[in-house]
Amino acid sequence: KGSASRTPTRRAAAAAANRSTSDFSGCFTAMAMLSAFELFGLPEKFAIDLDQLEKAHERAILKVHPDRFAGRPAAERRVAEQWSARINESFDVLRDPVKRASLLCETAGHPVDAETNTRMPADFLMEQMAWREDLDGAKDESAREAVRDKARAKFAECESKLESAIDAEKDWTKAVDLTRRLMFIGRFLEQTSAKSSPML
């Protein structure tokens, strides 16, 4: 569901969401109709500008900052809190490549279903087992970091393939498989080092 297919109702919702925060009539309903991408004015694609996302988040969250609603009616403060929660939730989804890819797959009608479908190709699982064995056998932190570097390289490779599968090919079967691989590798990095992050 790209921005090109946005209906008049969704265009009206986008316009309402960009009005002054003093206009609360129907604003939360309008916001609820927007996708995470539309909320920040970004194209619905995997390859997004993270700096642009960061700046859009800062602008959006400033509009609902508690200081702007000091002394305002309780109803307005509650709406501002709802806006803030939705803005932060959408930001967390879009800045995480796994969550972003999962959202795009689901929007296209191809949910990743990571919680219910845990089957992965044997060669992929063997690679993960080899990484863990190498970590267990590593004699120093330098050797362990070398293993994590392999995982980070594989994570970056999956990200690149996802960009092609989603943004260029629209191959959702491939995109779902790559998203699940990205999820497994990211989990490996999180589990093996508190300082390691697939986002880096």
Region roles according to the model:
Residues 5-7:
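Intrinsic low-complexity, disordered N-terminal segments enriched in polar/charged/small residues
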Residues 12, 18-200:
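C-terminal accessory/regulatory regions appended to core domains
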